[in-house]
Swiss-Prot record:
UniProt family annotation: Belongs to the MinC family.
Any one GO BP annotation for this protein: regulation of cell septum assembly
Keyword hit for S-adenosyl-L-methionine: no
Name listed for the protein in its UniProt record: Probable septum site-determining protein MinC
InterPro entries on file: CAP/MinC_C, MinC, MinC_C_sf, MinC_N, Septum_form_inhib_MinC_C
Lineage top rank: taxon: Bacteria
Gene3D superfamilies linked to this entry: 2.160.20.70, 3.30.70.260
Organism: Shewanella loihica (strain ATCC BAA-1088 / PV-4)
Self-association and partners: Interacts with MinD and FtsZ.
Protein's job: Cell division inhibitor that blocks the formation of polar Z ring septums. Rapidly oscillates between the poles of the cell to destabilize FtsZ filaments that have formed before they mature into polar Z rings. Prevents FtsZ polymerization.
Keyword Repeat attributed: no
Alphabetized UniProt keyword annotations: Cell cycle, Cell division, Septation
HAMAP family: MinC (MF_00267)
Amino acid sequence: MQKPSLELKGSSFTLSVLHINDADLDGVARELDDKLAIAPQFFLGAPLVVNLSAISDPDYNLAGLKDLLISRQLVIVGITGAPSAIANQAKALGLALIKSGKQSQTQPQLPKTTKIVKQNIRSGQQIYAQNGDLIIIGAVGNGAEVIADGSIHIYGSLRGKAMAGANGDKNAVIIAQNIDAELVSIAGQYWLTENLQAHASIKSGCIRLDGDSLTVEALSL
């Protein structure tokens, strides 16, 4: 029997949600550029759902926002939380309207995996553990990036960038034997070098979220 030319099947994907909290596109552009500068390769071509629930202006410049994101090589999958006037703009621009809702209690969760890398991660390299944790047996050098949807464990020095909870997991942690990072991030909350310098006395530690703020605890590793 000949295989059909196409099939329509249901599926689910993890997408990042960009919350727009201010109608000022210039301000949005500045803050977005700051975030993109932190990890440009991670965000490049990233599919986004844009949440506009904080925008009440019916004449909001959605076309301008779309152009702003496209010019930075971000891909808008659709919008959510928009009032009807903005939703009509979205339809005219060919953007999908996505309904947000709570996941069913019975919906199966993706199995969590662990990616183990037994080598030093050098400048310019990026390691990503999708749908799971990342274990690095080695050092993460300056200019290197390690990213995980779950937690990150580094059995060595962390001098580059480490981004855990990349899909929004606020329970993710970053553990390293020697923390001297350019950036650490959990579920979008991040510290740069200057933030980490305030905790310079802690070398081996666990970085986690406490509410919406990062905190670091000393460990004996």
